[in-house]
Amino acid sequence: MTITANKRHYLEKVSHQGIISALAFDQRGALKQMMAAHQEGEATVTQIETLKVLVSEELTPYASSILLDPEYGLLATKVKANQTGLLLAYEKTGYDATTTSRLPDCLVEWSVKRLKAAGADAIKFLLYYDVDGDEQINLQKQAYIERIGSECTAEDIPFFLELLSYDERISDNNSAAYAKLKPHKVNGAMSVFSDKRFGVDVLKVEVPVNMAYVEGFTEGEVHYSQAEAIKAFQDQEAASHLPYIYLSAGVSAKLFQETLYFAAAAGAQFSGVLCGRATWAGSVPVYITKGEDEARKWLCTEGFQNIDELNRVLEETASPWTEKI
């Protein structure tokens, strides 16, 4: 794979020696739910913006880049560490739960040109995709991603595509039924969107198994032997020639770190992570119940510990994207 000099320059800005140790805080709907669990009533715009600022101030000195949204995160972009790169999200949050299609939608007041002008070093777009889903729906999704890829090509800025797999017939992605399908769903979507017509530079993906069902990682029911889980990671590596990074999917910091060791040992040559809740989730109840100062203390201690430990794991497990580009 070859990229332009400008795209390479931007990728260097969001990584450190070819490893992307990025902090994800573009959550909107999920963050509102987390906040609402600790107070009466919905989270306010000020609450959301302020927590994003706190996280950006305290944790970006230890991240190669931060992913924020332009809806609530623009103030946070102003206080990030100077050496830390910036990814901006282009999609609307959530999806229509009354249908199985989960069609994508851009933020209507934004374009790649505008996100770049707001300081983005890369553009991130999230797509829900069922590789076995309705053919017409998938054609619409593919056309949508082609348009975003073309925008990023025109602006000469890297395109990070986040793929979240699902099955149109299974509502619970954490179920045993979905766990059996997950390797095929995750790796199949990666293969589809690695085609050059989509203009994707980096894939942000799930690990291809639910680690809660992997032999040796659970005390409950097992749905993958160690050998089956290893093969799922090997198949993932074979599914794409593009650099790819892992999302944390809301699991604990400890499980995410253990997963990265397992992935690397299996032969997955991932180039880093975009890690969100595994790093900062514990700050939410502290912020809501005890205020800004206590949240800042949490970020400086436990938040720092989470990101520092993750960086150490990445040093041992991740492969530079420069090996693929």
From Swiss-Prot:
Keyword Lyase: yes
Pathway(s) annotated for this protein in UniProt: Carbohydrate metabolism; D-tagatose 6-phosphate degradation; D-glyceraldehyde 3-phosphate and glycerone phosphate from D-tagatose 6-phosphate: step 2/2
Alphabetized SMART domains for the sequence: DeoC
Superkingdom as given in the UniProt entry: Bacteria
Molecular function, one GO term: tagatose-bisphosphate aldolase activity
NCBIfam families the UniProt entry points to: lacD (TIGR01232), PRK04161.1 (NF003180), PRK12399.1 (NF009065), PRK12858.1 (NF009498)
Protein name per UniProt: Tagatose 1,6-diphosphate aldolase 1
Organism annotation: Streptococcus pyogenes serotype M3 (strain SSI-1)
Lineage summary: Bacteria, Bacillati, Bacillota, Bacilli, Lactobacillales
